[in-house]
């Protein structure tokens, strides 16, 4: 069954400006600017003003199936992530896990890449270049922890995945050999009191 019109709106917080140009959403805030392309979705994006004068983003789906109606909520979640990115930012913390051989990691290239040494006692140096807009630092408080910061949640989480995949244990039982670098905490760069 097709629904004639399904739509949802979301509030735009103060200090954030949103521009809509043919399914390309541009969000600008105190931490920078993010652009997201929704051309693959059969949705209409509009900026509206409610009776109180507050700006809102409205997403419509005309004659959509259940999948199209579900895509509305997905698009709203993506825009919410963009707003969170330009206001608070995203911070992922990764911990080094090892049993015998301590993992040595050095951050190079102006906090844009990491080199991993002595993983499972191997001599090979594993180098991971982070995606654009993501920076990495060593944690001062916690031993064997790195912190990844960025505005785009997808770039930060994909950079974490690249680091995690570089430390993949091969030809051993992964239930026994739990060595690696794993995400331990996800949060915002700007923490509200």
From Swiss-Prot:
Pfam families found in the cross-reference section: Ribosomal_L6
Listed GO MF terms: rRNA binding; structural constituent of ribosome
GO biological process: cytoplasmic translation
Keyword annotations from UniProtKB, A to Z: Ribonucleoprotein, Ribosomal protein
Stored InterPro entries: Ribosomal_uL6-like, Ribosomal_uL6-like_a/b-dom_sf, Ribosomal_uL6_a/b-dom, Ribosomal_uL6_CS2
Keyword Cell membrane: no
One GO location term (cellular component): cytosolic large ribosomal subunit
Similarity annotation: Belongs to the universal ribosomal protein uL6 family.
PANTHER family (alphabetical): 60S RIBOSOMAL PROTEIN L9, 60S/50S RIBOSOMAL PROTEIN L6/L9
Name used for this protein in its record: Large ribosomal subunit protein uL6
Organism encoding this protein: Pisum sativum (Garden pea)
Lineage summary: Eukaryota, Viridiplantae, Streptophyta, Embryophyta, Tracheophyta
